[in-house]
């Protein structure tokens, strides 16, 4: 039996991973057991199993063809998992690079994953900026609230494109400061069967 495959995305600092983990805890109490898979981790595990890299830092140095092959294999690996249980893929809709925005889920990955739903977690650029500034555990590029808003707009555009290519629905979930529970509840309601 095929289960639901949901992709959850958001800009760094929006709280997508946090909101997803909390939603999954609530669903587990209802005997709805999603497995959360970070796409970057799945790629690393594939590359490591193929003896392409030894540590995660080497991933960035791989040539484009190797990256593409690993992405495709990671997508296939996750697609196999969905036969056993529902899956939430934690990833980025777009990645901001010095040369522009890069699709987080290129067509060859979408072809393998074939998601049912894409969730974009958002809040205001100002809130994300404040979260990033107060998070001393991460080293992030300095951006303005306007830069963050642009990145969120690009995430929305990419998510809709992914929906067009796969037939997946696209849902925007707000994760506003002080209102985490509301965002979690909204995600719980769409992850239920």
Curated annotation (Swiss-Prot):
Keyword Kinase among UniProt keywords: yes
Residues where ATP binds: 10-18
GO CC field: cytoplasm
One function term, GO molecular function aspect: ATP binding
InterPro entries noted in UniProt: Adenylate_kinase_AdkA, P-loop_NTPase
Compartments, record wording: Cytoplasm
Record's subunit section: Monomer.
Family membership: Belongs to the archaeal adenylate kinase family.
Name of the protein in its database record: Adenylate kinase
Gene (name only): adkA
